[in-house]
């Protein structure tokens, strides 16, 4: 019997060798090396976490948090290092989405006859 986790671990290892992963690692390093960008990224990450927690608990986002998000988003859009990081991250997630489609195909195929 196959150990699927061995395959998953190999996939994770292989992922680190892709151009997309390497580009993201470089983009993260660029942000880390710029104090302003790193601080802005941390602030953005903390606010996004707060927003997600509010959504998960069904609590409305305060006007203060909405304004903070808008202001922070404006700052992020003007920070070339973070914009580059986010674009690079998106490229990696597109690759991961393609991989997910590949390993989900057998499951989708099981249901194909039911969908007809």
Curated annotation (Swiss-Prot):
InterPro entries: Com_YlbF, YheA/YmcA-like_dom_sf. Belongs to the UPF0342 family. This is UPF0342 protein LBA1592.
């Amino acid at each position: 019997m196959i150990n699927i986790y061995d395959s998953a671990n190999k996939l994770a290892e292989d992922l680190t060798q892709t151009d997309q992963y390497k580009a993201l690692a470089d983009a993260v390093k660029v942000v880390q090396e710029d104090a302003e960008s790193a601080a802005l990224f941390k602030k953005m990450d903390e606010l996004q976490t707060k927003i997600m927690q509010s959504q998960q608990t069904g609590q409305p986002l305060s006007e203060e948090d909405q304004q903070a998000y808008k202001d922070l988003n404006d700052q992020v859009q003007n920070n070339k290092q973070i914009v580059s990081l986010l674009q690079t991250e998106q490229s990696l997630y597109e690759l991961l989405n393609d991989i997910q489609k590949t390993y989900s195909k057998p499951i989708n195929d099981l249901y194909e006859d039911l969908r007809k």
